[in-house]
Amino acid sequence: GQFLEDPSVLTKEKLKSELVANNVTLPAGEQRKDVYVELYLQHLTALKR
């Protein structure tokens, strides 16, 4: 997959589906988009370095 340096360009739904697809556990309940952006940066963007 193509992991973005700036995941904030994605929609929240897209962020969530990308995280789930990469076996990242989502926080319970509905979070602000920046929560998912942070998870994406921690788990996905970091993987490609």
Swiss-Prot record:
Q: Which InterPro entries match?
A: LEM-like_dom (IPR013146), LEM/LEM-like_dom_sf (IPR011015), LEM_domain (IPR051656)
Q: Name one GO molecular function term.
A: DNA binding
Question: Record keywords: Manganese included?
Answer: no
Q: Give the start-end ranges of region Biological activity.
A: 32-36
Q: Show where the LEM-like domain sits.
A: 4-47
What the entry lists under CDD domains is as follows: LEM_like
Q: Keywords assigned by UniProt?
A: Hormone
One Pfam assignment: Thymopoietin
SMART domains listed in its UniProt record: Thymopoietin
What the record says about family reads: Belongs to the thymopoietin family.
The free-text function statement in the UniProt record for this protein reads: Hormone of the thymus with pleiotropic actions on prothymocytes, mature T-cells, the nicotinic acetylcholine receptor, and pituitary corticotrophs.
Name of this protein: Thymopoietin-1
| Species | Bos taurus (Bovine)
